[in-house]
């Protein structure tokens, strides 16, 4: 049976995307001059970033779509970590969609957008 192993995001600005995901605590390697990077998350799933040029190299008809076809949700170790991670990203100039709040379902929750508009949720149990 197929298993989810990776999530891919097409980046319009690889350096900015790498900076964003590093601010969230991901161990994203440097990739000077390359159009692809991936990082294995603690869960074992890989987050892959590719430039538009890489995608067009094997799919020339590719065009960036509007709207979001996916979102990411990153579990933090505590409610405080949600707040700190959100504040760090917004202070660095990244877009905060929704400031941290105590959700009725029992989690501290916040929403950011990565440099290409991909929603990134941060959460932790209360």
Predicted segments with their positions:
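Amphipathic alpha-helical segments
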Residues: 13-27
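Conserved beta-strand-loop-alpha-helix junction that forms the acyl-donor binding cleft
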Residues: 11-13, 104-105
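Residue-level signal for the nucleotide or nucleotide-sugar donor/cofactor binding architecture
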Residues: 9-12, 77
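Vicinal oxygen chelate
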Residues: 1-5, 27-113, 124-126
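Conserved catalytic core of two-component sensor histidine kinases
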Residues: 8, 15, 83
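Conserved active-site tyrosine of GNAT-family acetyltransferases
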Residues: 17-21, 89, 117
């Amino acid at each position: 049976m197929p298993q989810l192993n990776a999530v891919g995001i097409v980046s319009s600005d690889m350096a900015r995307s790498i900076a964003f995901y590093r601010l969230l605590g991901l161990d994203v390697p440097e990739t000077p001059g390359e159009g692809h990077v991936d990082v294995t998350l603690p869960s074992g799933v890989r987050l892959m970033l590719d430039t538009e040029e890489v995608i067009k190299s094997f799919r020339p008809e590719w065009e960036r779509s509007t709207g979001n076809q996916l979102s990411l949700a990153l579990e933090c170790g505590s409610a405080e970590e949600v707040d700190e991670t959100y504040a760090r990203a917004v202070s660095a100039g990244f877009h905060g969609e929704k400031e941290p709040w105590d959700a009725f379902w029992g989690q501290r929750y916040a929403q950011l957008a990565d440099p290409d508009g991909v929603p990134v949720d941060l959460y932790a149990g209360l």
